[in-house]
Amino acid sequence: MAIIGIGTDIVEIERIREQRDRLGDKLAKRVLTLDELAIYAAVNMPERYLAKRFAAKEAAAKALGTGIGRGVSFQHIHISNDDNGAPLVNFTDGAALRLAQLGGCKGHISIADEKHYAIATVILES
């Protein structure tokens, strides 16, 4: 195993809350997959959930070396949780293609949040 990419992102939760208040669910629909949107609609603090997913997907895109754009969209990166609640990152479409181009086989993710911020780090391995 070798590390082939690493990315980190931090998001101010209040900024997400303000966008949600101003634009409704427009950002959520752009960032979240259908499965993630279903969870977002059911959680108690949707702006916190969205901030964590936004940070996670930005971190994953940075680890891929592209950022969002250049063939990788938010919809190509899916964040879920295993049976113990640990986060998982999965790649499809353009993100999966980029991972393969890098010789990657797996992504590891850590997500954390506090009162004001959400942060995520993604490590890609070959």
Curated annotation (Swiss-Prot):
Please give a single GO biological process term from the UniProt record: fatty acid biosynthetic process
Enumerate the catalysed reactions. apo-[ACP] + CoA = holo-[ACP] + adenosine 3',5'-bisphosphate + H(+)
The prosthetic group or cofactor this protein requires is: Mg(2+)
One Gene Ontology term of the molecular function aspect? holo-[acyl-carrier-protein] synthase activity
Q: Give the UniProt keywords, A-Z.
A: Cytoplasm, Fatty acid biosynthesis, Fatty acid metabolism, Lipid biosynthesis, Lipid metabolism, Magnesium, Metal-binding, Transferase
Q: What is its EC number?
A: 2.7.8.7
Which SUPFAM superfamilies does the annotation name? 4'-phosphopantetheinyl transferase
Question: According to its UniProt record, where is this protein located?
Answer: Cytoplasm
User: What does this gene product do?
Assistant: Transfers the 4'-phosphopantetheine moiety from coenzyme A to a Ser of acyl-carrier-protein.
Protein's recorded name: Holo-[acyl-carrier-protein] synthase
